[in-house]
Each structure stands twice: as structure tokens, then as C-alpha cells.
Amino acid sequence: MNQHLRHQPIPFIDTAAQRQRLGKSLDDAVARVLAHCQFLGGPEIIQLEAELAAYCGAKYAVSCSSGTDALLMVLMAQGIGPGDAVLCPSFTFCATGEAVALTGATPVFVDVLEDTFNIDPASLRRGIATAKRLGLKPKAVIPVDLFGQSADHDAVAAIAADEGLFVLDDAAQGFGASYKGRRIGTFGLATATSFYPAKPLGCFGDGGAILTDDAGLLERLRSVRAHGGGSDKYDNVRLGLTARLDTIQAAVLLEKLKIFDDEIAARNVVAERYTAALADVVKVPRLVDGCTSVWAQYTIRLPKGVDRDTFAAALKAQGIPTAIYYPKSMHQQTAYRIFPSADGGLPVSEQLSSDVISLPMHAYLDEATQGRIIDVVRGALA
């Protein structure tokens, strides 16, 4: 291989390639918004919400300003507050627990499964018992579809039904994935997702959405999204937020949605190549039978004895970026140590935080470039 190409940096996520592919269609979509000047609540918002709902098979979609606000809006609309407990995995991005804490409720952290990185049903049951022992009222569970693969929604739903909890699916990384033949977006009371630019379906700024089949929740969410407003603009009926998605972002998402399935297929090809080439030297993620992933990340686990920082430095020296999702689980972070964890501890979350590392993953990663990544990974572990 040419020495220059060997060290030429590889993008971790290639948004520029996607931008080039969409080209004039994106320019025209944004230009239409600039022409009609309906920057909030424009026709693209209505169209996007309809298309998101149809894509997932949900009755309703509510666009909003971020994936974090999507979680928070549902919790607020459901009246979650002080004295309540909401169960969520610790091994995830902080927004999951943050949204709970912002309502005044208590996040109770539970463990995950080591091969899928998703919520462990047994730990969930222990977490519910922990919450009750502490005098809290368990009200909800937030499973996370981490790294693009769905949680075990049947198991979560069964536990939630037994305990009288509602389920809020955190699909910030899992929009477009499927579980047992059903697309994410129809499990539980509601699904929250994110359109952050690095997500599989991302806009050109912050954005998010909520999917639900519950008409009553739909109306409350629309109210919460705009300061808790009611029929009289200046007589707010509940506490709310400023959480609208702007029309330019909706226009961008409508164009990206047109190529989304094609990009998911390409991501799966990339994931399959990684798995085939690396399964003998690292622990690769397990894709559950009957499920599909959108591969928001391709996260591997390094063998015992391999120093993660040294490994990452070896790849960086060859122009290959890596990322660590997540170096600390939520219960280990300064702001969240005060909140309880399920009895028995969270050993899997803690172990994952010490040995996971993510490789470049996007729909435009060609076979030759990926081959270079694979060769360097194997060389760094030799």
C-alpha cells in the first residue's frame, strides 16, 4: 500500500460523503424553507411527523429539539416527579438518566448483558426491588437500544406489566432497527429518538422525535413541547419546555429519510465484514436472532491484558480513529453517583467501561478502506 495512503486519516463517521450523495436535493429542500419563511411549524414539520410515524408503524410522531428533550417530554407528560423511580441501564449515554433526574424523580441504574450491551432483565427485576426497599415508587423503565440494536422488548414488557410500569424506549441510537419483525418505534408507551448529526438518521443540528400510539399522550406532548400551552396561548395548563424542531432540520431529515434504508443496508455490510474478520481476535457484538441493527456504532471488546490506550494510540498512528462508548457507566460518574443501583451491583457495566472501543462505522466505508482498518487492528493485537 502507498505509504501516504497508509497514514491518510479515515473519518470515524463520514457525513461529508452523505452530503455529497444528496447534493442538490438538500440544497433545494433548505431553499424551499428559506423561501416560505415558516422556520417553526412549517409544512415540512407536518410531513416529517407523518413520514416518521409511517416508517415505524406508529400512529403518531411528535418532532422535538433533541433526543434528550424527547425523553424528558414523555416523563413530564406522564407526571413523573419526586418520589418516583425510573429504571434505566447504567451503561449508556448520560441523557437517559439525566432526563429522569431533571424531573425530580430518581433514576435507579441496572446492569446490561455483556454480549448485546442492552438491559439485563434479571438486573431490572433487582432494580425494582431496590427502589421499593428505598421507599421509592417504581413508575417506568427506559430500555436503551444501544449501538443500534434493540433491547429485549418482550422481556422488558413482561416485567413492566407485572410491576405496573410504563415503558419508554430510548431509541436515540436504534431508530430504523427491528425487533422480531417490528421496527423500533412501537414498543411500550412511547419511543424517543435522536437526530443528532452523528446518528444513523441525523440532521444538520440537534433534533429528536417521540413515537406513540396513545392519543392522550400525543396531546400532552404537543403541550409540553411549547411551554405547556393549552387552547389559550397565554393560559398555560402545565409546565413545559421550548422543545420544537425547526423547519430547516425537518427539511433535511425528509431528504435523508429517502436514502435511510439503503444506508442501513450498507452499514450492515460493513458490520458483517468487521465480524467475519475480527471475531477470532476480539469479542465482537452479538446480533440477536430475529433482530436487525442500524449499527450506530461497531463496538468491540478487547482481550484481557490489552491496554486500551495503547491499542487506540497504535490505530491513531495509522490514521484510524477510535472512540470509547462509554469510559464510565452512569453510576460511576460524578453527577450520578448519588443515585441508587440495583442490588448486586453492576459488574457487567463496569467491565464494559474498561474494555470496549468502537471502530469507524458509516454507510460509506468502502471495502478497501475497511480492509486497512482491519489489518491495523489485527496488527495492533498481534
Where are the regions a protein language model picked out?
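Structured binding elements
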Residues: 104
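Phosphate-binding glycine-rich loop
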Residues: 37-85, 99-101, 109-111, 137, ...
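Active-site phosphate-binding strand-loop segment of PLP-dependent enzymes
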Residues: 115-203, 211
